[in-house]
Amino acid sequence: PGRVDIDLRPAIVEAKARVGDWELDTIVGPMGLRGALVSMVDRCSKLVRLSLVPSRQATLVADAIATRLGEHPERVLTLTMDNGLEFARHRNFGAALGADTYFAKPYQSWQRGLNEHSNGLVRQYFPKATDFSTVTAEDVRRVELLLNSRPRAALGYFTPLEVFHGTSAKPSVALAS
């Protein structure tokens, strides 16, 4: 209930012209194993935030999103996710962050293409066979730092950290204030 279709997002979100528009997903291990990663990617800076959760239960996922993105609430404007049950509490974390929430159409993962690409980068460190119940928060932070410190061609060879924190700006980037 209360899901807003991705087609209703403001045009500026599609333009990737400002920091603060996030794509959300979860990364899981093999069937039957507990634990998951919540992945959050800023569309403009490509900054990745990862949070380890013991399961994809909606309450745990909502708390993880509110906590990690709540570190910089001024840089959270919109949240776009798939229709997974783990995002059932979107109203809660959207309200906690003061952000509008949007949902991709079912079976159209390309509508959150940056997030899917970023999940592939995360999989370089945590392959599909990973049992996330054995992964530590320190492991997750290390991978997050590696990804966010990697210069990107799409960012003029600046890093996601540099663009997100405004120490350098990709051309025509507007930082959320």
Short names for language-model regions:
Residues 1-37:
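Mobile-element integrase/transposase regions
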Residues 46-51, 103, 128:
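Short small-residue beta-strand/loop micro-motif enriched in glycine and branched aliphatics
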